[in-house]
Swiss-Prot record:
PANTHER family: ARGININE-TRNA-PROTEIN TRANSFERASE 1, ARGINYL-TRNA--PROTEIN TRANSFERASE 1. It is found in: Cytoplasm. Belongs to the R-transferase family. Bpt subfamily. NCBIfam families: PRK01305.1-1, PRK01305.1-3, PRK01305.2-3. This is Aspartate/glutamate leucyltransferase. One of its GO terms (molecular function) is leucyl-tRNA--protein transferase activity. The keyword Transferase applies. Its main location: cytoplasm. Its EC number is 2.3.2.29. HAMAP family: Bpt. It catalyses: N-terminal L-glutamyl-[protein] + L-leucyl-tRNA(Leu) = N-terminal L-leucyl-L-glutamyl-[protein] + tRNA(Leu) + H(+); N-terminal L-aspartyl-[protein] + L-leucyl-tRNA(Leu) = N-terminal L-leucyl-L-aspartyl-[protein] + tRNA(Leu) + H(+). The gene is bpt.
Length: 257
């Protein structure tokens, strides 16, 4: 993790939050380091912060700052040499007919209802399954950086023509795309929407000639976060330096050949 003095952001201040229940590892306490003031964090500054391991939730920019745990490791896909695995190719083929519409961050009631359904099925009891409209908007639709909303729908010729399947929020950085949050139809048990979404972002970054897709934090002990290791080549931010996944990750965490 980069030291504060290494950040070329002298106008910003950083503070640590009080401990709170970790949302990834049960029974653990977490703390975050928050960058302030929010109004100074424009797209250029945010790009630098992301390279230093920060993420954002609405207008709040943060990174893990836990007392006795370092499980959250920033990760990014190197897109130029990326080759999908067999399972990823199957996911791409299964969902390639979905129509993607890129738009500014905008409230749509249909999106909000899908978000509530996703939270109630995939993260029941996590606290977000009862988010109000205001909480939803503050979490996903407030941004001071270069952000996009992408919705994925069934094509007109399908049996479920126009049905909303997935919504993704993405930030455009100087050196890549940053995946903010994605939610999708959780009732389609055989679908691979999450995998397809990452593949779609990688393809977009390649088309834009951006070198990376930032996927947030890789957490080996968390099933919800460990999947990111399936997208190779992956780099991890360790001791302030971006290094190849295979050079720093435990052998057991590496994807099968």
């Amino acid at each position: 993790m980069s030291k504060l003095k290494e950040l070329p952001l002298s106008a910003l201040q950083f503070y640590a939050t009080a401990p709170y229940a970790c949302s990834y590892l049960e029974g653990r306490l977490a703390r975050s380091q928050v960058a302030t003031p929010a109004h100074l964090i424009n797209a250029d500054v945010y790009s630098k912060l992301v390279r230093a391991g920060f993420r954002r939730s609405g207008i709040f920019t943060y990174r893990p700052h836990c007392d006795d745990c370092h499980a959250c490791t920033p990760c990014r896909v190197v897109v130029a040499p990326f080759v999908p695995s067999r399972a990823q190719r199957r996911a791409a083929e299964r969902h390639q007919s979905l129509e993607a519409l890129v738009a500014p961050l905008t409230y749509v009631e249909e999106h909000y209802q899908l978000y509530l359904l996703y939270q109630s099925v995939r993260h029941a009891g996590g606290g977000m399954d009862h988010d109000s409209r205001d909480q939803y908007e503050q979490f996903l639709l407030q941004s001071r950086v270069n952000s996009r909303l992408v919705e994925f729908r069934e094509p007109p010729e399908s049996e479920s023509a126009g049905r909303l399947r997935m919504v993704s929020m993405i930030d455009v950085l100087e050196d890549g795309l940053s995946s903010v949050y994605t939610f999708y139809d959780p009732l389609e048990r055989k679908a691979s929407y999450g995998t397809y979404n990452v593949l779609w972002q990688i393809a977009q970054a390649q088309a834009l000639e951006l070198p990376y897709v930032y996927l947030g934090y890789w957490i080996e002990q968390s099933r919800k976060m460990a999947y990111k290791a399936q997208f190779q080549p992956l780099e991890l931010l360790v001791n302030g330096e971006w290094r190849r996944f295979e050079d720093v990750a435990p052998a057991a965490a590496r994807p099968a050949e």
